[in-house]
Amino acid sequence: MCIRDSLAVVAAGAFTLPRTGGEESPAHTSVASAGPSASPTTSASASAPASAKAERLAALLPADVGEIEEVSLLALIKNATPEQARTTYLGPLDGQYAFRKDGGVGYLVLTLMDREALERKMGRPADPAEDLCARIGQEPARDDCVREVLPDGRTLTTWHDSMDYSGDDSVGWGPELVGRLAQSDGSQFLVRSSTGFEGSGTQGPLLSEPPLSRQQLKKLLTGPEVLPKG
């Protein structure tokens, strides 16, 4: 598996059953986005109840993104048990969320990975200055790729992925917007704003477009609410 595909799988929840005993097993609690003017829950712990995480996320987003529910893609697609689907998260809003709008269901997957975890997955040292828009070897080019160096030195890269490649035959993913925020300490936020999937475990038709736009992803990833406290 190439580096690009490896990190995409990580962001999707790595559809293999993990070891049990992790931190979280998402409860299926839906909340409607109240828009960025709403006050988020005061607790920002990564182990907060799933409903509180969905509420905090919804408070950061425009009201028109739809109804938000924290889910487990492993449970949906692979029928994982709650114990098998438990995941340890680094960021207070890390998780997998369903977005329901206009009869369709899309997904947002947000994952903060530290340098060590990235290096294990990539098989090489993490480089915060790497240009992800540059084609490497035989990897496919990233469509509509935009790389932005932020004033604080972090680098945000976003691109579109048609998801038109072979994988799990039981699931067909729709197009998505992908984001990677590289931080100076070597950690990275990985995010997928997906139009959804069809096949095993589907919750509804694909959305006509990713649930969060490029600008909405940027605002979310660069805000303090997604960073661990302390």
Identify the role of each PLM range.
Residues 8-230:
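Intrinsically disordered, low-complexity prosegments and terminal tails associated
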